[in-house]
């Protein structure tokens, strides 16, 4: 063999070895890549499976809800149809075995109710055993005023009678001082001055004819009672007490607005 052929053979053997080496390394790389791809594929398949499991659990719950909603809807429609059937029977429709539509049933019901209300308004029932107790059905309605009852009248009349009795008793007790036509008692224009002394002192006794001024029962009409001549003719001449004159003088012409009282007081003052 020549040296040239030997060199060619050695180069070819080296190339084959390197090729075999590369070929052996390539399957290893391809195996590694396939393992990575398989691992990636397994990991990618796990997530969709979990999602599928979740999706499968959700429709189960929604299906139960749909079933319950359907049951409720069927029951509602059944009640609805039964109510319309009862209304059709109450209207006594006669369509040769055909049912009225829902709209026609409602229209007939409205017309029937309107006709009945008009009839009852024009022809009220006579001799009703039990009248309606609602306030809206009464003639006065809700704003009817309450009629005064006998009990309310008595409760109002009793305090009024008591007030009148007390007023009459007070006036009867005051008439012993203000009796006589000369100067009738008046709360606004009194005939005597409030500063003058009306009653005598305790040491001065009253005449037996008139009794004590404080005793209402023993009082006799002499000074201010009786007629005009008896009141100012005899009574003033027989009075021995000076305080009567002082009282009349102090009363004077200031506190007697009455014309008759004015002239009488002027006459007494002149005496």
UniProtKB/Swiss-Prot annotation:
**Positions of the UniProt region annotated as Disordered:** 17-49
**Which species is this UniProt entry from?**
Danio rerio (Zebrafish)
Biological process terms from the Gene Ontology for this record are: developmental process; pectoral fin development; regulation of transcription by RNA polymerase II
**One Gene Ontology molecular-function label:** protein dimerization activity
The job of this chain, per UniProt, is described as: Transcription factor, which play a role in limb development. Is an essential player in the regulatory network governing transcription of genes implicated in limb morphogenesis.
User: Protein name, please?
Assistant: Class A basic helix-loop-helix protein 9
UniProt-listed SUPFAM superfamilies:
HLH, helix-loop-helix DNA-binding domain
Q: Which CDD domains does this entry report, sorted A to Z?
A: bHLH_TS_bHLHa9 (cd18912)
Localization, UniProt: Nucleus
Is Transcription regulation a UniProt keyword of this protein? yes
**Where is this chain primarily localised?**
nucleus
What the record says about disrupting the gene is: Morpholino knockdown of the protein causes severe truncation of pectoral fins at 72 hours post-fertilization.
Here the segments flagged for biased composition (Acidic residues) are 22-38
Q: Which SMART domains match?
A: HLH
Superkingdom, taxonomy of origin:
Eukaryota
UniProt keyword annotations, A-Z: Developmental protein, DNA-binding, Nucleus, Transcription, Transcription regulation
């Amino acid at each position: 063999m020549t040296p040239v052929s030997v060199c060619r053979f050695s180069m070819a053997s080296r190339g084959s070895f390197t090729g075999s080496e590369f070929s052996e390394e390539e399957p290893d790389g391809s195996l590694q890549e396939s393992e990575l791809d398989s691992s990636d594929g397994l990991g990618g398949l796990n997530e969709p499976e979990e999602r599928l499991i979740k999706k499968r659990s959700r429709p189960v719950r929604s299906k139960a809800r749909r079933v319950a909603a359907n049951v409720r809807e069927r029951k509602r429609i059944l009640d609805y149809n039964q109510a319309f059937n009862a209304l059709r029977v109450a209207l006594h429709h006669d369509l040769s075995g055909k049912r009225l539509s829902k709209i026609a049933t409602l229209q007939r019901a409205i017309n029937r109710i309107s006709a009945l209300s008009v009839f009852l308004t024009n022809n009220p029932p006579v001799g009703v055993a039990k009248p309606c107790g609602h306030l809206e059905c009464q003639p006065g309605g809700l704003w009817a005023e309450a009629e005064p009852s006998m009990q309310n009248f008595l409760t109002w009349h009793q305090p009024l009678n008591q007030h009148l009795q007390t007023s009459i008793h007070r006036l009867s007790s005051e008439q012993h001082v203000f009796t006589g036509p000369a100067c009738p008692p008046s709360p606004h224009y009194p005939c005597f001055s409030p500063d003058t002394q009306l009653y005598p002192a305790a040491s001065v006794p009253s005449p037996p004819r008139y009794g004590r001024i404080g005793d209402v029962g023993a009082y006799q009409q002499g000074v201010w009672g009786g007629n005009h001549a008896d009141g100012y003719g005899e009574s003033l001449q027989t009075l021995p007490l000076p305080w009567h004159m002082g009282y009349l003088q102090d009363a004077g012409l200031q506190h007697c607005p009455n014309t008759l009282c004015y002239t009488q007081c002027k006459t007494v003052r002149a005496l």
